[in-house]
């Protein structure tokens, strides 16, 4: 069975958010809005469900992995 269109769009938004999160200077709320979420809270909930961590924790781990 395939992926529902809504789930596909969420996956694409989160993938784009991960790219943007690699830019440490961009606020999480700006990223949430730029990838199509109406609020940072909803973005964080969906991000954690799909990525396993909150956006802030994911960013910290990703950036630490690049430099550590």
Residue ranges of each PLM-predicted region?
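Key DNA-contact positions within bacterial/archaeal DNA-binding proteins
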Residues: 41
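…primarily DNA-binding HTH/wHTH and HhH modules…
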Residues: 45-68
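Short glycine-/small-residue-rich flexible loop motifs, especially phosphate/cofactor-binding loops
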Residues: 29, 44-45
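Terminal helix-turn-helix DNA-binding modules in bacterial transcription factors
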Residues: 1-38, 60-68
């Amino acid at each position: 069975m395939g992926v529902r269109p809504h789930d596909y769009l969420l996956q694409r938004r989160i993938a784009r958010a991960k790219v943007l999160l690699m830019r440490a200077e961009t606020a999480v709320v700006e990223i949430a809005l730029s990838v199509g979420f109406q609020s940072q809270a909803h973005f964080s909930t969906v991000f954690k469900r799909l990525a396993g961590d909150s956006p802030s924790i994911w960013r910290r781990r990703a950036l630490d992995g690049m430099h550590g």
